[in-house]
Amino acid sequence: MSAAPGLLRQELSCPLCLQLFDAPVTAECGHSFCRACLIRVAGEPAADGTVACPCCQAPTRPQALSTNLQLSRLVEGLAQVPQGHCEEHLDPLSIYCEQDRTLVCGVCASLGSHRGHRLLPAAEAQARLKTQLPQQKMQLQEACMRKEKTVAVLEHQLVEVEETVRQFRGAVGEQLGKMRMFLAALESSLDREAERVRGDAGVALRRELSSLNSYLEQLRQMEKVLEEVADKPQTEFLMKFCLVTSRLQKILSESPPPARLDIQLPVISDDFKFQVWKKMFRALMPALEELTFDPSSAHPSLVVSSSGRRVECSDQKAPPAGEDTRQFDKAVAVVAQQLLSQGEHYWEVEVGDKPRWALGVMAADASRRGRLHAVPSQGLWLLGLRDGKILEAHVEAKEPRALRTPERPPARIGLYLSFADGVLAFYDASNPDVLTPIFSFHERLPGPVYPIFDVCWHDKGKNAQPLLLVGPEQEQA
């Protein structure tokens, strides 16, 4: 105590309330507090019952801490010293030590441990330190503002996490629900098919069984007749033998052929599981978009049907395009009336045996005038067919990327767009049960887009086939 008598009160004061300890407790990290102060400042405990130490943030359990009896006895002894007096010399604390930043008495200042330190009368020190209060208050306010911003950010992130988890669970539940529905429907369909096969096979087998039993009965009857003839006298034997053998040969020649049953059920193998997966993949696609062509955007050579789901290039000379910037004036193309801006979308286009076409999406603010530079940086994401056999992806390059040439060009194209995932995928949708991947763009779209359909020039009748938008009731060409 004699080494630093003025510091004893500070050491026995709670860092939270700045008063002498009241029922002091010492956390696992070594810091001590009034029990009530620790519970008040720490707030609600975590799931494991711990709170963060206000001084070092180490976890501690305030309810499990016992009162520090040594600190309590020291506090009780110090409390007997009059307020504002030296604990060692009991003289008034009238001098401020700048070096140790504490109040001391005259004896400590002149003879004790603070001798030779920078000392000020208490009144002068009070006046000088008061001038520092505004700056310290400002620092405190700035620190509070920074922490409040941090708290706001964390609270916002917490809300975002909750929303993200909610959306994730919803999406998982929705997709797995669709899978369960698909598999249940498939199981029911296969069960009905198995029941049909069993019924058909049962009818055929029972019919065959009845026929064979009837034939077998005839053979047994002939066996009895032969036994009876064997015992007949010579004349009667010879007369009946010829009749019996003739009848027997006729019966033998009428023997029914063996039954041939064609039981056709799927073989449960890895290929079966793969085929089921491919069918389920198609079933999980979003509902088919009911798109229609926008006649106001169509090149003058294009003819859009009244239903808005069929477009073809006319071989008649077309008038020049007008001044409407929504209309294509060079590219023989048209966009859909529907603007897509968020979520998931899936649509299909019947291309048939058309030898040249291009499909995809176009940025809403992309220019439709002049020759189109079909690359993503210009707001166009396209896949097309050239010369009736070469599929091309219009990527960011001087020339389109030629894809693997299919044995048979797709007659129907499926397009899947996900704004959240940044995916535009193209599929061969010719098989009504299976989608076969062709190509995918993987990038976040900069904004809303229109589905675009490049019909291409009719090429003197060689490319006159129309494009059809597939809907709930597909329009026939």
UniProtKB/Swiss-Prot annotation:
UniProt-listed Gene3D superfamilies: 2.60.120.920, Classic Zinc Finger, Zinc/RING finger domain, C3HC4 (zinc finger)
GO MF entries: identical protein binding; mitogen-activated protein kinase kinase kinase binding; phosphatidylserine binding; ubiquitin conjugating enzyme binding; ubiquitin protein ligase activity; zinc ion binding
Binding locations of Zn(2+) 3: 86, 89, 105, 108
Enzyme nomenclature, EC number: 2.3.2.27
Binding-site residues for Zn(2+) 2, renumbered to this chain: 29, 31, 53, 56
Residues covered by the B30.2/SPRY domain: 271-475
GO cellular component, one term: sarcolemma
Reported tissue expression: Muscle-specific. Exclusively expressed in cardiac and skeletal muscle.
Effect the entry attributes to changing residue 144 to A: Does not affect homooligomerization
S-nitrosocysteine: residues carrying this PTM: 144
Post-translational modification: Disulfide bond formation at Cys-242 occurs in case of membrane damage that cause the entry of the oxidized milieu of the extracellular space, resulting in homooligomerization.
Matches recorded under PANTHER family: E3 UBIQUITIN-PROTEIN LIGASE TRIM
Protein name (Swiss-Prot/TrEMBL): Tripartite motif-containing protein 72
Gene source species: Mus musculus (Mouse)
